[in-house]
């Protein structure tokens, strides 16, 4: 085993034509676009690349599907030179480079929380809505299992992570508080991520809101809160 971090790069391809573009390129994909499109989250495929190194050896790339953004995306991992060649081929295919800001917008549009921004060590998985993809209900004992099982079988959490459409307004700061709609001043929620969303045609935010709250105040505006699951 050796650390290959400095020798490895990755590129993510996002969009409705992403799978088809990857399949068209000279990567020797073992699966076609339709198989990529139906792959489960985190599913890996080995890809034999057309790129050769100085020794004439075929480089190997790996592609994994992610549902962390909208639309779905695929991330390709491999040697730096091979990934650089893939990047150039994607540009030639008409792909447009985008940075972390765009990725963040697509993530919020997908309603996917990220650790360190929307979650921390004090967040319960049911609060963040990640139980289905982050908790194994059949696994043996693990730290926090009793709490998870108790919530699942006999209770509920008092807050939920929600995606909130704020409209065509100046973007509020991360951490901005949501207050009760009755004007009492009671804090009923807090924003964790805020982005400008072309899809929503305005500001889109993620934040935790107390269970049962359907409307809240953000400054002098009323924000509609999606219903509890």
Give residue ranges: language-model regions.
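Anionic-ligand-binding alpha/beta catalytic cores of soluble enzymes and soluble regulatory domains
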Residues: 75-165
């Amino acid at each position: 085993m050796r650390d290959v971090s400095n020798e490895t790069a990755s590129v993510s391809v996002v969009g409705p034509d992403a799978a088809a573009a990857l399949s068209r390129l000279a990567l020797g994909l073992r699966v076609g676009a339709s198989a990529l499109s139906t792959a489960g989250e985190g599913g890996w495929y080995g890809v034999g690349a057309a790129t050769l190194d100085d020794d004439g050896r075929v480089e190997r790339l790996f592609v994994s599907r992610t549902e962390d953004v909208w639309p779905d995306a695929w991330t390709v991992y491999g040697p730096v030179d091979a990934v650089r060649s893939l990047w150039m081929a994607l540009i030639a295919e008409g792909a447009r480079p985008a940075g972390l800001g765009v990725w963040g917008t697509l993530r919020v549009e997908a309603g996917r929380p990220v650790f360190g921004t929307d979650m921390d060590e004090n967040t319960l998985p049911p609060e963040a809505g990640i139980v289905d993809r982050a908790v194994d209900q059949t696994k043996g004992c693990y730290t926090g299992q009793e709490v998870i099982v108790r919530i699942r079988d006999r209770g509920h959490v008092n807050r939920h992570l929600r995606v909130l459409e704020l409209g065509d307004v100046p973007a509020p700061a991360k951490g901005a508080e949501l207050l009760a709609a009755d004007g009492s001043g009671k804090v009923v929620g807090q924003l964790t991520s805020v982005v400008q969303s072309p899809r929503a045609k305005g500001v889109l935010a993620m934040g935790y809101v107390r269970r049962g709250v359907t409307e809240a105040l953000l400054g002098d505006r009323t924000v509609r809160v999606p219903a509890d699951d």
